[in-house]
Amino acid sequence: MRRTRSTRRALLVAVCLSPLIALAAWQAYPFRSNNFDTVSVSRGSIESSVSALGTLQPRRYVDVGAQASGQIRKLHVEAGDDVTEGQLLVEIDPSTQQAKVDAGRYSIEMLKAQLAEQRAQYTLARQQYQRQQRLAAGGATRTEDVQSAQAQMLATQARIEMYQAQIRQAQASLRSDEAELGYTRIYAPMSGTVVAVDAREGQTLNAQQQTPLILRIAKLSPMTVWAQVSEADIGRVKPGMPAYFTTLSGEGRRWTGKVRQILPVPPKPLDQSNQGGGSPTSGSGGQSGSGRVVLYTVLVDVDNGDHQLMAEMTAQVFFVAATAENILTAPVAAIHDDGKGGQVAWVVGSNGKPQSRQIRTGISDRLRVQVLAGLEEGDRLLMAAPDGSDS
């Protein structure tokens, strides 16, 4: 009987102490809830940047075309060859141009012979006129004969001037024909690498309406990235801003450079661009209709001394607006607006309960933000505001 009473008394004491034990345990352990995740404030580095896709192109290149019509007799280079300024690249059959030059020279020779004949005629006409003047002084000739001799002398003098003008005209035509003959031998306008060949030996070129393109020469260093930046981010990109990029084949290597230029107008689609115009990014300026995306072209120059970068490579570009190292950082998702133009974070206090703190932040990337004031290293933050809070 005594054992039964003792047992009941122990159970009664346990029931009375259970709430006190639960309260003490709740206060002793940190705040936990299945509805919230916590993260810690830690030190790290943040880079505020704008990302974009781009295409690599040689900064300096020239398209070599033909100014003379005819069949390509010899092509002296292939794609990938290094050339020097003045090197012979292409020979075009010069038969037609050579015939024009020969005809021009023969025409000049004929005109010179005619000029010599007229000079002889002028000498004779002048002598006859002088003779008539002497006869007229003695009254031995008529006035009409003197006038006729004078007219003959002046006419031959005029023909001399006419032939001289014709010779000058023929010489000008000959220079034009000789220049066209020179166009049948095409030389490198600059030193560089042949990056494309668009013609073949035996191909006939017609340069009457437009210049046929034969090949392209480019300097492979420096290269230029033609990056496409959305209109939402273009305001953050400035000339002279540092930038870096990676390529698919670069195995994580970073190439660095600076923004050289921001083109003020988005590139036109290919169907709106003039032939031979546009840019390497033409056609990517956006879509028509309400879903149109406007992209602006930003040019970044980069050294390519080791020739690891090639034309038309795709580049993932990052324009660096600001950087900070060894700073307090917190996840962007853990920072909330307080509704008054400020920012707050919910910190798990020493008693395990969430506390609201006013904070001040600096630069941020897409994941973390710099903490300037209000938090300390190691603080535990709630990723979401607790139930019942104003934030």
From Swiss-Prot:
Pfam families tied to this protein:
HlyD_D23 (PF16576)
Biological process terms in GO annotation = pyoverdine biosynthetic process; xenobiotic detoxification by transmembrane export across the plasma membrane
- Source organism superkingdom: Bacteria
User: What cellular-component terms does GO give this entry?
Assistant: efflux pump complex; extrinsic component of membrane; macrolide transmembrane transporter complex; periplasmic space
Which Gene3D superfamilies does this UniProt record tie to the protein?
2.40.30.170, 2.40.420.20, 2.40.50.100, 6.10.140.1990
Function, as annotated: Part of the tripartite efflux system PvdRT-OpmQ required for the secretion into the extracellular milieu of the siderophore pyoverdine (PVD), which is involved in iron acquisition. This subunit is an adapter protein that stimulates the ATPase activity of PvdT and connects the inner and outer membrane components. The system is responsible for export of newly synthesized PVD after the final steps of biosynthesis have taken place in the periplasm.
Q: What is this protein called?
A: Pyoverdine export membrane fusion protein PvdR
According to its UniProt entry, this protein's organism is Pseudomonas aeruginosa (strain ATCC 15692 / DSM 22644 / CIP 104116 / JCM 14847 / LMG 12228 / 1C / PRS 101 / PAO1)
Q: Which gene encodes it?
A: pvdR
